[in-house]
């Protein structure tokens, strides 16, 4: 009998651990000693010592990582050996799948997906493109059909058909012809056939692209029409039929199921990054970069420019109301006009009369209304406009309404126009459009009112007869009242008999007074025209005295 021990089986778990450790130890390269000569400069020597310390620290870190990796491999090999030695087939299969998934996730390269953000951005860009084109088509056909942009126009009645046509055209020009949508092309992505796992990307087949277009274009159209039909069958106040209720319930369940499946697929997409949507997963179509030569660089130049301009515009909107841009604008405009006038005039022309921009306009035309409604700025252009019958000089639109005149030049404008211009200048004055004077105030126009000139008392004294007539009338009335009272006291029995005679006498007296007043008024007017007011007033007083004497005798 020999003392030799039987050879150990290499497939046993106990033999796997030292083999893995030996392999890891043998695969780890041993760094060769490097002869380094220290420099003679003290500063260089100090930096050289620091570099050596950093190099030693890196080697120690690398050795620690290698030891940790070897220990992890040993523990993993032991776990795999235990799972393989398990008696349950289900446990062995489940453990192997779990370990395979863990290896895929924890490996350095992972699942090697294309950029998830790029794929999601591509989908968002495609949807925004469709919505943008729908908006443009809606604006184009806005006033057809119902008219006025209401709810009965073509955009709302044929919304599903418009979406179908747009999606079909976009699908033909993008995926069917170039294997990529516009959003995917902007992200440097293309659809590939995920059934092929080679290093060369294979474009999807025609049946894959055809099914993709049928589901994304035709499927969405049919689903929207189906939902619209169910909504119409609802009937509002009437209860729908049992068939419609069952169909609505089935539709809701399908929608819920599709939403749940899409959510689960999206979670898997976030983990693996292969299939963006549920349809891509079913058809085995994935987005991948067609070439790896294009580097992904993020530039913030556009974003920085937008932020700067946004901040600058907000600053201007905050500062301009405080600065008073209107006042500065008026000041600059006034300064520019004065400068032009000084440059255009010479020294001998300074004594000429000031003339405004619209001095050629007739008096009945408001220069401000004309400036707002007409482009003619000189007399030649005005005559041309009048000849072609296109001017507005003599129209009711430019005639002066509620005339007001400026102070001190006295030019006439509309009240609203003139007050608006003066108020707009905020007390700094407004240049008259007719004469060029600086206007700060205005007043009602007095052109239709004729003011009487008062004569000097040194030349002639005018006595008004109205005061004299009023005084004489009061005296006559008082005398008549006294006479009547005396007659009543002396002859109380004859009051009834003489009442009628007295009334007749009073009527005759009043008539004579009225005749005298009219005669005196006519005589007064004629006397004023002949400049003989003094003599006529004396005659009038004499007549009044005679009339009073006659009344006393009566």
Curated annotation (Swiss-Prot):
Reaction equations catalysed: [E2 ubiquitin-conjugating enzyme]-S-ubiquitinyl-L-cysteine + [acceptor protein]-L-cysteine = [E2 ubiquitin-conjugating enzyme]-L-cysteine + [acceptor protein]-S-ubiquitinyl-L-cysteine
Spans annotated as Disordered: 1-63, 470-554
Entry EC number(s): 2.3.2.36
Cytoplasmic side: 143-154, 232-241, 324-554
Acidic residues bias spans: 485-508, 521-554
Ranges of Low complexity composition bias in the record: 9-38
Compositionally skewed regions (Basic and acidic residues) per UniProt: 509-520
Keyword Zinc-finger: yes
UniProt GO cellular component terms: peroxisomal membrane
Positions with a binding annotation for Zn(2+) 2: 409, 411, 432, 435
A biological process from GO: protein ubiquitination
Main localization (coarse): membrane
Membrane topology: Multi-pass membrane protein
Peroxisomal matrix side: 1-115, 181-204, 273-299
The keyword Nucleotidyltransferase belongs to this UniProt entry's keyword annotation: no
Residues annotated as transmembrane: 116-142, 155-180, 205-231, 242-272, 300-323
Biological or metabolic pathway of the protein: Protein modification; protein ubiquitination
Keyword terms: Membrane, Metal-binding, Peroxisome, Protein transport, Transferase, Transmembrane, Transmembrane helix, Transport, Ubl conjugation pathway, Zinc, Zinc-finger
Zinc finger (RING-type): 366-435
Assembly information from the UniProt record: Component of the PEX2-PEX10-PEX12 retrotranslocation channel, composed of PEX2, PEX10 and PEX12.
Free-text comment on this protein's domains from its UniProt entry: The three subunits of the retrotranslocation channel (PEX2, PEX10 and PEX12) coassemble in the membrane into a channel with an open 10 Angstrom pore. The RING-type zinc-fingers that catalyze PEX5 receptor ubiquitination are positioned above the pore on the cytosolic side of the complex.
Family as reported in the entry's similarity comment: Belongs to the pex2/pex10/pex12 family.
Name of protein: Peroxisomal biogenesis factor 2
Organism: Podospora anserina (Pleurage anserina)
Gene it is expressed from: PEX2
């Amino acid at each position: 009998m020999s003392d030799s021990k039987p050879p150990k089986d290499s497939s046993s778990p106990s033999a796997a651990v030292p083999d893995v450790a030996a392999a890891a130890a043998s695969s780890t390269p041993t760094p060769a000693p490097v002869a380094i000569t220290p420099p003679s400069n003290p500063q260089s020597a100090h930096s050289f010592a620091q570099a050596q310390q950093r190099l030693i620290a890196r080697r120690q870190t690398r050795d620690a990582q290698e030891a940790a990796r070897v220990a992890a491999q040993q523990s993993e090999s032991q776990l795999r050996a235990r799972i393989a030695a398990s008696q349950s087939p289900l446990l062995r299969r489940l453990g192997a799948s779990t370990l395979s998934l863990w290896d895929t996730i924890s490996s350095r390269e992972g699942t090697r997906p294309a950029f998830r953000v790029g794929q999601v951005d591509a989908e968002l860009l495609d949807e925004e493109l469709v919505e943008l084109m729908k908006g443009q088509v809606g604006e184009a056909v806005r006033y057809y059909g119902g008219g006025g942009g209401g709810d009965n126009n073509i955009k709302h009645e044929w919304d599903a058909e418009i979406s179908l046509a747009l999606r079909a055209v976009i699908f033909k020009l993008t995926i069917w012809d170039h294997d990529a949508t516009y959003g995917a092309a902007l992200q440097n992505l293309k659809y590939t056939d995920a059934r092929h796992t080679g290093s060369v990307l294979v474009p999807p087949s025609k049946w894959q692209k055809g099914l993709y277009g049928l589901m994304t274009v035709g499927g969405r159209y049919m689903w929207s029409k189906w939902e619209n039909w169910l909504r119409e069958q609802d009937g509002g106040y009437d209860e729908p039929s049992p068939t419609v209720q069952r169909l609505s319930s089935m539709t809701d369940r399908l929608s819920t199921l599709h939403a749940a499946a899409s959510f689960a697929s999206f979670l898997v997409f976030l983990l693996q990054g292969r299939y963006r949507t549920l349809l891509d997963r079913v058809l085995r179509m994935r987005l991948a970069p067609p070439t790896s030569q294009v580097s992904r660089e993020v530039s913030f130049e556009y974003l920085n420019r937008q932020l700067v301009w946004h901040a600058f515009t907000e600053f201007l909107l905050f500062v301009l109301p405080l600065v008073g841009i209107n006042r500065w604008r008026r000041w600059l405009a006034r300064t520019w006009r004065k400068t032009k006038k000084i440059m255009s005039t010479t020294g001998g022309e300074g004594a000429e009369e000031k003339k405004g921009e619209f001095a050629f306009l007739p008096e009945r035309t408001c220069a401000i209304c004309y400036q707002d409604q007409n482009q003619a700025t000189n007399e030649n252009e005005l005559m041309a406009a009048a000849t072609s019958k296109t001017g507005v000089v003599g129209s009711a639109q430019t005639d002066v309404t509620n005339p007001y005149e400026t102070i001190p030049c006295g030019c006439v404008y509309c009240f609203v126009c003139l007050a608006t211009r003066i108020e707009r200048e905020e007390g700094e004055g407004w240049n008259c459009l007719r004469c060029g004077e600086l206007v700060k105030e205005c007043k009602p126009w007095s052109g239709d009112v004729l003011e009487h000139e008062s004569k000097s008392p040194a030349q002639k004294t005018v006595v008004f007869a109205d005061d004299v007539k009023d005084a004489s009338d009061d005296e006559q009335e008082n005398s008549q009242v006294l006479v009547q009272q005396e007659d009543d006291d002396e002859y109380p029995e004859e009051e009834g008999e003489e009442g009628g005679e007295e009334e007749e006498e009073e009527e005759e007296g009043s008539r004579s007074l009225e005749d005298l007043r009219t005669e005196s008024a006519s005589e007064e007017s004629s006397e004023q025209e002949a400049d003989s007011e003094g003599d006529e007033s004396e005659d009038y007083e004499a007549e009044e005295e005679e009339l009073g004497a006659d009344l006393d005798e009566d």
